[in-house]
């Protein structure tokens, strides 16, 4: 299952027509998958590559990596992690979405990709890691914020029950209201994960007219409270 920045990039390509006009494609230097050691072994075998697994005393979230040479002669690395930082493996696995990647030769490759909303949570969680406050990480975070409403619009166009999309909005609310990294991003960088909310005329009127304003008001109240706490500490 594809996770990390490459999942954000794949979703950006898949949902391009649902994203704001002019939004630049996001890239990723890494190709990360969620998987156990057996998955790493299988990948190395299928690709004719080399297998690397952490030693017992290695402090790493990786379960291993497969290094192989692609069809153009370039060495590539696939990193496998037990779970994305800040997320739970079983939840990521349960909510992953199957897509098909169109190849230049006309083939379509099936691929499981981390859910767009979990991509957002992953990008937010990563901001707490050393070395993850880079310009590239910021672009990936900004892109992930836009992916969630884009995915919601896609679901509505596909005729999916609007309640699925309102649940996405509730997940965004939970992230903005309770996640300490999301709060820090708002306070320190002005990054608002509530921009991932979708207000669409196809959603129930009660959700648009009542629930969304409630969400914004409750998060604003919590942010004001946090600012006041910080200010009092500064005065002390």
Features from the language model and the residues they span:
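Compositionally biased terminal segments of proteins
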Residues: 1-236
């Amino acid at each position: 299952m594809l996770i990390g920045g490459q999942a954000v990039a794949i979703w950006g390509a898949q949902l391009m027509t649902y994203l704001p006009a002019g939004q630049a494609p996001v890239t990723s230097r890494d190709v990360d998958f969620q998987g156990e050691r057996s998955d790493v072994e299988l990948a190395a075998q299928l690709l004719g590559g080399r297998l690397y697994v952490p030693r017992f005393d290695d402090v790493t979230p990786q379960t291993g990596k497969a290094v192989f040479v692609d069809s153009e002669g370039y060495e590539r690395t696939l990193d496998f992690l037990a779970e994305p930082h800040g997320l739970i493996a079983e939840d990521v696995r349960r909510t992953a979405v199957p897509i098909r990647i169109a190849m230049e030769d006309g083939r379509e490759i099936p691929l499981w990709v981390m859910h767009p909303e979990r991509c957002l949570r992953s990008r937010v969680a990563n901001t707490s890691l050393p070395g993850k406050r880079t310009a590239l990480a910021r672009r990936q975070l900004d892109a992930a914020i836009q992916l969630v409403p884009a995915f919601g619009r896609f679901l509505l166009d596909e005729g999916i029950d609007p309640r699925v999309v309102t649940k996405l909005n509730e997940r965004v609310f939970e992230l903005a209201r309770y996640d300490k990294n999301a709060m820090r991003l708002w306070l320190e960088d002005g990054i608002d994960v509530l921009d991932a909310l979708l207000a669409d005329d196809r959603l129930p009127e009660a959700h648009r007219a009542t629930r969304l304003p409630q969400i914004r008001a409750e998060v604003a109240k919590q942010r004001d409270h946090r600012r006041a706490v910080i200010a009092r500490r500064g005065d002390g």
